[in-house]
Amino acid sequence: MLAPLCTRCGAPTVWPVERCIECAGRRLAFASARAAVHYAGPAKAVVRAWKERGVRPLAALAADLVVAHVPRPAADVITYIPPDGDRSRRRGHQPAAGLARELALRWDLPAARLLTRVRRVGRQTGLPLEERRRNIRGAFGAVGRVHGTVVLVDDVYTTGATVTAASSALSAAGARAVHVVTFARTIR
């Protein structure tokens, strides 16, 4: 995504700001968030094909676009948003995990499964921001102690509710900082 961006959440802004209207006043558990592309048009079609139709090679394409548009965060490890078990079984793959593996190769970072779902969550699609936050709060737990700075990968940043909940779990487990990287971002 083209600058200027909010330094914190990565939302497009008219001029560079430390905290934009989207993240000002919110407690964000991550240090920064960046996305390669706007979630619209062709990017939306790519995500749908990748997630719902299982076109796994699109993870490599998405990783190439991320590397081209997102500076590599200074980090010790890369991880991903763990999928809902039912959706993962139905799809037969884990899109965020695939993107994390591809980025780990390109950024020469170790990839690790640092998070797990500790409770089931209803679908987030179509929910307003406050409902998304309530729905996802407390849904993630760390697999063990987390050391150093973490890159947290997901396919799409919509409201930040999912990555905030996951970042909270990583921080509670010892992460020094969490930098969120997604393929696409919804612009509100």
Describe every region a protein language model picked out.
Residues 1-188:
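Glycine-rich phosphate/pyrophosphate-handling loop used in enzymes and phosphotransfer proteins
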